[in-house]
Structures are given as structure tokens and as C-alpha cells.
Swiss-Prot record:
Keyword Iron-sulfur: no
Top-rank taxon: Eukaryota
Transmembrane segments: none
PANTHER family: 30S RIBOSOMAL PROTEIN S18 (PTHR13479), SMALL RIBOSOMAL SUBUNIT PROTEIN BS18M (PTHR13479:SF40)
Record lineage: Eukaryota, Viridiplantae, Streptophyta, Embryophyta, Bryophyta
Pfam families listed in its UniProt record: Ribosomal_S18 (PF01084)
Alphabetized UniProt keyword annotations: Chloroplast, Plastid, Ribonucleoprotein, Ribosomal protein, RNA-binding, rRNA-binding
UniProt name for this protein: Small ribosomal subunit protein bS18c
Subcellular location: Plastid, Chloroplast
Amino acid sequence: MKQAINKSKRSSRRRLPPIRSGEIIDYKNINLLRRFISEQGKILSRRMNRLTSKQQRLMTIAIKRARVLALLPFLNNEN
């Protein structure tokens, strides 16, 4: 009984997309790239950041380019 009640209480409201329509995935857009990196500097998975597979591919390429150009750190060891 409880399972049926919990399933019906799910919100039907859609979550906002993580990338707005005007934003371009680019290695120079550091503020956008930082939203998709964990505190340790790892690239977040598609499930966590709710990107499409194409957006995730472009985001990964942009993050790796920014790391090579020293715009983003490879690891974030602030300890």
C-alpha cells in the first residue's frame, strides 16, 4: 500500500535544464565548466548533471581542453 501512495506523490514538475538555450559549451567558459566538475576536480556523470549524451561529450572535451591550457586544475587538492 505504501509504495503505491509514494509513487503517486512524485512531482510531475520538470526540472530546469542544466544548460540554458543561450549558453555555448566552450573551453573558455570557465564558470559553466565548473558547474559540471566535482570538488575534487572530477567530471560529473551524466546522471548527476542531467545532460544529454551529446552535451556530455562536448562538456568532457571542453573540460579536458581547459585542463590542458591550465584554465582548470587536473586535481583540486586544497588539503
